[in-house]
């Protein structure tokens, strides 16, 4: 059984979250409009179409109406998690990565977490 020993609670992000978009920059590679699985004040779990090396320095960007965050981080882990989609039902490459956000930007990291938390609460209230 999986044991989660994280210091901070993770906020699950719904698959089709429309309150903002995530982007990841890994050197010359840029991944736009990628899925975020979860967010905490210290990290983000993302889906990307190719592997990223553990220890890579990346930038996580989040944009929503009237707000943008550009946060530096380090890839802590990357694992293949192919998905099946579409009529053909063929798997396509997908990698889940865990990014630890730079603790030197703790205020901006917390703002990202709070913005998502507020956005998700608004969606629940409207449902």
Place the predicted regions along the sequence by residue.
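Short conserved beta-strand and strand-loop elements enriched in small hydrophobics
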Residues: 18-24, 55-69
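Short, surface-exposed secondary-structure edge patches
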Residues: 47-51
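Short beta-strand-centered aromatic/proline hotspots
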Residues: 71-76
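Short, conserved beta-turn/loop elements at beta-strand boundaries and strand-helix junctions
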Residues: 41, 77-84
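N-terminal helix initiation/capping motif
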Residues: 1-41, 113-127
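C-terminal output/interaction extensions
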Residues: 83-127
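Short coil/turn motifs at beta-sheet boundaries
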Residues: 10, 29, 39, 53, ...
